[in-house]
Design a protein with these regions (language model features):
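Cationic, low-complexity basic patches in intrinsically disordered or flexible, solvent-exposed regions
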Residues: 566-570
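Contiguous beta-strand segments within globular domains
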Residues: 34-65, 204-206
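Boundary at the C-terminal end of the N-terminal hydrophobic targeting segment
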Residues: 21-25
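Hydrophobic, helix-prone linear segments
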Residues: 26-30, 36
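Positively charged n-region of N-terminal signal peptides that target proteins for export
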Residues: 1-5
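Bacterial N-terminal signal peptides
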Residues: 7-18
């Protein structure tokens, strides 16, 4: 691959016209306009020795990534590699290891793909950390066998060329879920996925049984199932956060008494959304045709659509809706909060059908991607789409960053054999939308299907989908939800009322909507199960009267004062 230093710096430079109002903070991207200084700062990373193959050193693969973070008390408890930090964008640089023979790798502005540079212009106190990413079995750069350095404190002078040496002293171990008395960790080989990838592929889940499941004298023997799809970056280990509450005797009247299945939705490309694609393989079919039947053979589960519920937040929310619509004979009800775009005329702030670029709007201003609430009607834009894509490019220009846009491309774009990666939705330098790829994406536009498939999708949404989203969603996902809501309600006005709903909750953002959604969805799940004879009758007292979990008041939206680590991962249990 060609080096991408210049295109990425050009992307950052082009941000200047609209970035002044965004208070970009540490990056000071406007300095990218200054002429290159005479000094040349370098970072030297000692690479591990290569294994011998038939007497010769094996070729190197993967990327070396440098993460930078201002040495600031507000981020003292974070390591640079804990990013990207969406509320305090950080410089990132990376170098491909392809063709590298030396054991000492030089990283500077001339060799690296850089976001937030040039590196030569850094001044003052920073911390830098190196990561060697040679694994492609897990999302992101923390896969088994990958290595990292300790964070190194540096103090850059404006007029002195300096070198920093980093040693890769840490090794990431393969992820192992923690032992928990109320969780069973299950794995099952997928024949469909193994055939697609021509290697062994397993599907995984964390299982939480309800109170009474293992009691032979308990009156209920067969149980409904709630399938939980984690949000972006989440895994089946989300079960650990929820197990004690879900299996508690005291929660029986407030929490659906079901077997809760926490799925894994991560691939090397990012969140696959159980959406079949050339890149991710038949992940949806594997879930429905292999994994769910396996669970229903192994456990005492009611094998009927009305007994299978699916829920999720953010990317997990989009996935829950997708599964309910794609497999109506499997899932009988869906509960989704703050889903990824459900109407591509509002793909965050971009109309995929009419706009030319993801980076700029019709007025020429920068398109925002992530915001925070400042007041009743005021937001602060922390990150633009240009920022976000440039960050992903700096992590891996070949589409393997594991971040959000690369994950969307893996789900919805055609696979490009020449690139050995999904085809990008837009030009990484200009943001210009690739119309061929966009046409492929439209097959996954839920609102478009509501309008165009003769009422089938509209009926399913109206009958089976319960959707909540804050009006101040951090990623502007409320705009797509509002448009889908209008289209479904227009269909309902012509046809009939149904138990599903789409509601926008005033004042809540991407994170603060989750406790409200949890309370509301638990109540809705209980009502659904009772309506189908799958739950005990409602108690004579409400959760608020009994003090059971789920009765806690919903707090007003608040913002974390420190930088957010991967805000898209705020996938709370529903």
């Amino acid at each position: 691959m060609p080096r991408l230093t210049c295109p990425i710096l050009a992307s950052a430079t082009a941000l200047l016209a609209g970035a002044a109002a965004h208070a970009q903070g540490d990056l000071a991207l406007d300095r990218a306009l200054e002429p290159a200084p005479a000094k040349q700062d370098r970072y030297l990373v000692k690479l591990p020795q290569r294994e011998l193959v038939e007497g010769s050193p094996a070729p190197r693969t993967g990327r070396l990534i440098l993460f930078f973070l201002r040495d600031d008390p507000r981020t003292a408890d974070r390591e640079p590699m804990d990013g990207p930090f969406f509320e305090r964008l950080q410089p990132i640089a990376s170098v491909s290891l392809e063709g590298v023979a030396d054991d000492l790798l030089v990283v500077d502005d001339r060799t690296a793909a850089v976001f937030g540079g040039p590196l030569d212009l850094f001044e003052g106190a920073w911390r830098v950390q190196a990561v060697l990413d040679q694994d492609f079995t897990a999302s992101g750069f923390r896969g088994p066998g990958n290595r990292a350095s300790e964070p190194i404190a540096i103090d850059r002078a404006p007029d002195a060329a300096e070198e920093t040496v980093l040693e890769l002293t840490r090794t990431f171990a393969a992820a192992q879920p923690p032992a928990h008395p109320k969780i069973e960790w299950l794995e099952r080989r997928s024949a469909l996925l193994s055939a697609h990838f021509r290697r062994e592929v397993v599907m995984r889940a964390g299982i939480v049984r309800p109170f009474g499941y293992d009691d032979l004298s308990f009156p209920r023997r067969m149980w409904p199932t709630v399938y939980v799809v984690p949000g972006f970056g989440g895994t089946r280990e989300m079960a650990v956060q929820q197990a004690d509450g879900l299996a508690s005797r005291s929660a029986r009247d407030a929490v659906p008494q079901a077997v809760w299945v926490f799925l894994d939705s991560e691939t090397p490309w990012g969140h696959h959304g159980f959406c079949d694609s050339e890149t991710n393989g038949p992940v949806g079919r594997a879930l429905v045709e292999e994994f769910i039947p396996f669970l229903e053979e192994r456990m005492r589960l009611v094998a009927k659509p009305e007994a299978r519920l699916v829920t999720g937040h953010s990317s997990g929310g989009w996935t829950a809706i997708h599964l309910a619509l794609a497999y109506p004979d499997t899932f009988g009800a869906c509960f989704a909060s703050a889903p990824d775009p459900v109407d591509f005329t509002a793909f965050q702030r971009t109309d995929l059908y009419r706009d030319k670029s993801f980076f700029t709007g019709k007025d020429g201003g920068e398109t925002p991607s992530y915001r925070g609430i400042l007041g009743p009607s005021d937001d602060r834009v922390f990150m633009t789409v240009r920022d976000e894509m440039a960050t992903e490019q700096a992590l891996d220009p070949d589409g393997r960053s594991g971040q959000q846009w690369d994950a969307w491309e893996a789900k919805w774009s055609p696979f490009d054999p020449a690139r050995n990666a999904p085809r990008p939705i837009c030009d990484p330098e200009t943001g210009d939308i690739d119309l061929v790829v966009a046409e492929e994406w439209t097959r996954h536009d839920i609102a478009r299907r509501v309008e165009r498939d003769g009422g089938r999708t509209a009926r399913l949404v109206a009958e089976r989908v319960r959707l909540l989203c804050g009006t101040r969603d951090s990623f502007y996902l409320n705009e797509a939800v509002a448009r889908l809501k209008a289209k479904v309600e227009a269909w309902q006005a012509r046809e009939r009322a149904a138990p599903g709903f789409i509601k926008l909750v005033e004042g809540h953002d991407h994170g603060s909507i989750t406790p409200l959604a949890r309370i509301r969805f638990h109540q809705e799940m209980l009502a659904h199960l009772r309506a189908h004879g799958l739950a005990d009758p409602a108690p004579s007292t409400t959760p608020a009267e009994t003090g059971l979990p789920g009765a806690e008041p919903v707090s007003p939206p608040v913002r974390d004062a420190r930088p957010a680590e991967q805000p898209r991962e705020r996938a709370q249990g529903l």
